[in-house]
From Swiss-Prot:
Upregulation: By UV light treatment.
Cytoplasmic side: 22-513
Binding-site residues, heme: C445
Membrane topology term: Single-pass type III membrane protein
Identification of the protein by name: Flavonoid 3'-monooxygenase
Keyword Transmembrane helix belongs to the record: yes
This enzyme's EC code(s): 1.14.14.82
Length: 513
């Protein structure tokens, strides 16, 4: 124990010495750093973050303004908390902030930065991004898997009809639907249900463990001199999980390769396998097995909880605002009718539903703080010096509630996005910086198109197909809307409801009615 304490003490002293020299070398810039709360010795501003850092950082804007400087351990962190500041970082200086800072999760679980989400900005990242855009998330690719999403959403609606008067945890059922759809699109397997095999069970449990580990604060990421000690055992758990995950993905990859032409382009993995050995960039660049596995890992971890939690929040908001629910249902009844279920191609003709979903993204972004970026070089933003190596966080949640951008920012008002509304031309695809739930710039979410389709289609289906009543006699105005902070912004209390079918049984695929 004494040896461990001495090691920590020596490592800390060494870092303090290095920081003193760094301070002297850069002292001409220090008075130009963005403002922020005074850091504590060693741990910096970590104690200031609290359990809901997006809210804590938003509150700091009142005191320090829309660009903040923090010290988390020994890491310089800059927070963008307004539309104009975010645009400076992610548009004007986008190239300088196109890489990610080092972190234990990417190192130990995401194939040592060989994935798309955490890969350094450069040639290999551009190649992976091109593969994703052209082969996985293009309009054609999304259309090819449209039937999968329709089938899984149909399964969900039939289950909701069959529950009768029993209450259901809506978020849980929606999550199962999204996981099954993505599992079939990715690897040709459902992960929930009677036809899910033992490999699917294993995969699902590993994803759950990975999401939990990725949300753990690892002190080694912020005090690098302590990283090798793995004081919390986080790195060890990540390494063991990665070993299991890699074995699973390797077996699935081998199975697909053995099936050869029989499985060509039947799922995303077979598409990726077909690209192996192909010159993808005109310079001999091809896709490796490791990169294929890393891409699968990215798609599954990024695409499940985010979509499911967003739909869960949307239905909760509509239950709280029955007048808005009625308007959305009336639009669906007029455009689609009650004789068939809504499908993805109908969404373009449902402007009010689209406005509801935009407003839901505004108040409940799936990731309230962006994934971190790193400054490749020092630069100046709004007159402040941003040191090389600084970590950038964009407070997506705070920007979307900024009273300088939004009238009545805490109210749920889809009309603001309709023609004549204050934000009628605003979209969620990264060009309007007051609303960037998928991020912006070069590192915008690669799966934006699939995620948006999934969320729109699921929400439309649940609105068209059912009226909703809260369980336990809870009234809409008493519905708990507290959030639980993590990798995604989940509801703190599950949304437990009674679904009441509003269409004929045959529309749900349950026979003539």
């Amino acid at each position: 124990m004494a040896t461990l304490f001495l090691t920590i003490l020596l490592a800390t002293v060494l870092f303090l010495i290095l920081r003193i020299f760094s301070h002297r070398r850069n002292r001409s810039h220090n008075n130009r750093l963005p403002p922020g709360p005074n850091p504590w010795p060693i741990i910096g501003n970590l104690p200031h973050m609290g359990t809901k850092p997006h809210r804590t950082l938003s509150a700091m804007v009142t005191t320090y303004g829309p660009i903040l400087h923090l010290r988390l351990g020994f890491v310089d962190v800059v927070v963008a908390a307004s539309k104009s500041v975010a645009e400076q970082f992610l548009k004007i200086h986008d190239a300088n902030f196109a890489s990610r800072p080092p972190n234990s999760g990417a190192k130990h679980m995401a194939y040592n930065y060989q994935d798309l989400v955490f890969a350094p900005y450069g040639h290999r990242w551009r190649l992976l991004r091109k593969i994703s855009s052209v082969h996985l998330f293009s309009a054609k690719a999304l259309e090819d898997f449209k039937h999968v999403r329709q089938e899984e959403v149909g399964t969900l609606t039939r289950e909701l009809v069959r529950v009768g008067t029993k209450p259901v945890n809506l978020g849980q059922l929606v999550n199962m639907c999204v996981v099954n759809a993505l599992g079939r699109e990715m690897i040709g397997r459902r992960l929930f249900g009677a036809d899910a095999d033992h490999k699917a069970d294993e995969f699902r449990s590993m994803v759950t463990e990975m999401m939990a580990l990725a949300g753990v604060f690892n002190i080694g990421d912020f005090v690098p001199s302590l990283d090798w000690l793995d004081l919390q055992g986080v790195a060890g758990k990540m390494k063991r999980l990665h070993k299991r995950f890699d074995a699973f993905l390797s077996s699935i990859l081998k199975e697909h390769e053995m099936n050869g032409q029989d499985q060509k382009h039947t799922d995303m993995l077979s598409t990726l396998i077909s690209l192996k050995g192909t010159d993808l960039d005109g310079d001999g660049g091809s896709l490796t097995d490791t990169e294929i596995k890393a891409l699968l890992l990215n798609m599954f971890t990024a695409g499940t909880d985010t979509s499911a939690s967003t739909v869960d929040w949307a239905i909760a908001e509509l239950i709280r605002h029955p007048d808005i629910m009625v308007k959305a249902q009336e639009e669906l009844d007029i455009v689609v009718g009650r004789d068939r279920p809504v499908n993805e191609s109908d969404i373009a003709q449902l402007p009010y539903l689209q406005a509801v979903i935009k407003e839901n993204f505004r108040l409940h972004p799936p990731t309230p703080l962006s994934l971190p970026h790193i400054a490749s070089e020092s630069c100046e933003i709004n007159g402040y010096h941003i040191p090389k190596g600084s970590t950038l966080l964009t407070n997506i949640w705070a920007i979307a509630r900024d009273p300088d951008q939004w009238s009545d920012p805490l109210a749920f008002k889809p009309e603001r996005f309709l023609p004549g509304g204050e934000k009628s031309g605003v979209d969620v695809k990264g060009s309007d910086f007051e609303l960037i739930p998928f991020g912006a710039g070069r590192r915008i979410c690669a799966g934006l198109s699939l995620g948006l389709r999934t969320i729109q289609f699921l929400t439309a289906t649940l609105v068209q197909g059912f009226d909703w009543e809260l369980a336990g006699g809870v009234t809409p105005e008493k519905l708990n809307m507290e959030e639980s902070y993590g990798l995604t912004l989940q509801r703190a209390v599950p949304l437990v409801v009674h679904p009441k079918p509003r269409l004929a049984p045959n529309v749900y695929g349950l026979g003539s009615g």
